[in-house]
Amino acid sequence: MTKLPKDAAEVLLFNTLTGLRPTEAVLSIQLIKREPEKYINKETGMLEHFRYPDLFIRKTKKAYITAFNEVILDVADKADTSSWMAIRSQLKRRGIESHLKYCRAIFATYLRKQGIESEVINIYQGRVPTSVFAAHYLKTNIQDDRNRILKAVGNFYE
């Protein structure tokens, strides 16, 4: 990460801490900066992607929610808000290969190794139908899942 421009490195870190897809991560950073009052739910500690279905709820790829804390918001604040393709081009010019899909895989694998259930990881990574997400978000203790995920992810940056 030391070879990267600081703002591009922050995008990679944000991507790893949230488990979002590359384009979703950049969109999320943009929304955190542009529309925090609508996008950031401080009461639940969630970034609420589902409020932007045209951006995050697509036919085959979905992102509903992301747990956040102040560290994650600080990373987003320092991150580049260009498109993913612009960031990728910037890295390519420096001779740095960019495989952001690995950030998402690191997130999921690490959470699983920390004892987070696959079902919870699948919800956070948008690998469930909208109806399953709605049932989980409304009926389970989302705060408990959020706290466990943030505790596990906290080891990335401590």
Task: Describe each region flagged by the PLM.
Residues M1-P22, R104:
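Basic, Lys/Arg- and aromatic-enriched nucleic-acid-binding interface segment
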